[in-house]
Amino acid sequence: MRQGFVKAAAVTPKIKVADTKYNAELILDMMKESTRQGAKIVVFPELCLTGYTCQDLFLQERLLQGAKDALMKLVKESASLDAIFFVGLPFEILGKLYNVAAVFSHGEVLGLVPKSYLPNYNEFYEARHFVSGAELATEVVLPDGSSVPADRDLLFVCEQMPKLRIGVELCEDLWTPNPPSISHALAGASVLVNLSASNELTGKDSYRRELVSGQSARLLAAYIYASAGEGESTQDLVFSGHNIIAENGQILAESKRFGHGILYSEIDVERLCAQRRRMTTFVTEDQTHTEILFSLKIEETKLTRFIDPAPFVPTDRQNREKRCDEILMIQAMGLKKRLEHTGANAVVGISGGLDSTLALLVTVRAFDLCGRDHKGITAVTMPGFGTTDRTYDNAVKLIQSLGAEFVEVDICQSVNVHFSDIGQDPSVHDVTYENSQARERTQILMDIANKKNALVIMVIALLVLL
């Protein structure tokens, strides 16, 4: 949890339908394994204590009591584990049955978050058993005598890392036009968890992946999606255990479908908060959310997530070429506007290196977009003390192949005069030696541009201006 990184786990146990004792033991084992691997946020699927596919057994008191007893067992026996857990179960509140996520940590239930949107179309009929928790806001007394909130609008805030603020939604909630995760994020949630039981249809995995990725991007948040898998009844549906962990549109980790197990990745909470600060249109609203504190130990987080050493350069050749063409077109369109507005020609200094080559290619593309002859581009080579035959030959061939006007100005004599004027020893190859040549080249380009009614085009970094 140092430097803003928090390890998360999305867990799919191989449950037995309606066997709450078996499921509780299995879930407890996976909770222990997750924390052994350093996970601090551990998310299980929707209704995992009973199974999603219990159908009318959900209406039986024995199953509901078994689920409640199983929850209390998990809470008690996980008290020594340093993590916050999210486990799904059916829960009766005020005589009605809700599909809830129980949230607990260090032997204490922090709250119950009910599902808001109950699918009752196509292959789904949740409204047969459950009621919506969209308007639920009450206190529930648990078997141990503790009273906890049952409310959709709960935020779980880490005392040791206040930027770690977690909001909860369940399965269908994400698939609706107005998911609860939107209000959670606007109330400050940096991490969103989804306890799901999403069945498989041909092509549904792609839609699910895009949904999770898109929601994390839209809300500048991390999104942990844990779905039901093996063990559920296959009478009507098949569940694949498709788990996903995403961060601001990037899929950090994704499980292989049609299995069970634990998916891990690390979430960069500080990065998410920094991105929200930069986006001035991301305005947190004064919500009615209730904040509930929990504690975690601050420990080193071993990073397993992929860190791209070249984040702007796609490894796939086709995508790389597409990205390069996009960059070239963006630059060329910007230059095209200036050329059309001024009616000017262009002057480009060519050394044979990457920067000047890019400047010339962008200029050529801009002239093509304007429908202008490349002879309006003056390409200038300015050999100096360090110019090699290779870079010089590259520069000349490039200019000739693109059909630009070729001009050569040797700067050695003028730079030597300048060295004499300022008392610089030509044998001392220091910053003055290097920058004197660069400034001489810039002066030449500016003067030629004045003569030709042209703009000087170059790729430049702020450092060059120092």
Residues of each region from the PLM?
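Enzyme catalytic cores with a strong preference for nitrogen-chemistry domains
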Residues: 1-349, 365-374, 406
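N-terminal beta-alpha lobe that positions the nucleotide/phosphoryl donor
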Residues: 40, 51, 77, 82-83, ...
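A glycine-rich phosphate-binding loop feature that marks nucleotide/adenosyl-phosphate handling sites
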Residues: 91, 346-356, 414-415, 459-465
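ATP-dependent adenylation/pyrophosphate-handling site
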Residues: 193, 346-350, 354-396
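Nucleotide-activated chemistry modules centered on ATP-dependent adenylation/adenylyltransferase
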Residues: 193, 199, 220, 415-424, ...
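Alpha-helix C-terminal capping segments
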Residues: 217-218, 361-367, 447-452
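A conserved beta-strand->alpha-helix junction
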Residues: 262-264, 293-311, 372-432, 438, ...
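Generic hydrophobic alpha-helical scaffold/packing signal
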Residues: 328, 332-336, 364, 378, ...
